[in-house]
């Protein structure tokens, strides 16, 4: 069963609180929170120069990474740190919108054209299914990339038939030989699919 996961780029509503930087200093900083290895280091290094060409202003980029969606959301929700741009999966965006944790995207920036309307209608429709009330998701998030959760296996040790059978993840033959992605959603999803395998095969769910 294929599961598509969108990674989205969005603006985060942050509470300044007792921050150490003045508001003016904070405006000269772009804080990005993303998955590891998603943006080339050369892009991060070149961004300040591009930004100055667009606006005439200097900018400092602070780039932090996370490996679990829930860790990212908790860090922001509890006000441990503020970010301007974060890149969570789509279900986290839906939860953040419910709690008014997001700011609309500024579409008028420097000399850069607004390419957001060129996004495929299908993708825009899919994103907007998560909209809350009169708030359209596409005003707060942009599709960044997508991925498919799957299973990797060593063909010298596992046959194709074994790899296609979800139950083999619990097979004693593979005990202590299986590694799983550290993702609550993927782990729960796999367990639920396995528990309802018969109903799925019968088309009941």
Model-derived regions, located:
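C-terminal motif of bacterial Sec signal peptides marking the signal peptidase cleavage site
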Residues: 15-18
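Intrinsically disordered low-complexity regions specifically enriched for long asparagine
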Residues: 20-25, 202-204
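Early extracytoplasmic/lumenal segment of secretory-pathway proteins
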Residues: 22-99
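Extracytoplasmic ligand-binding site segments that recognize negatively charged/polar headgroups
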Residues: 38-41, 91-205
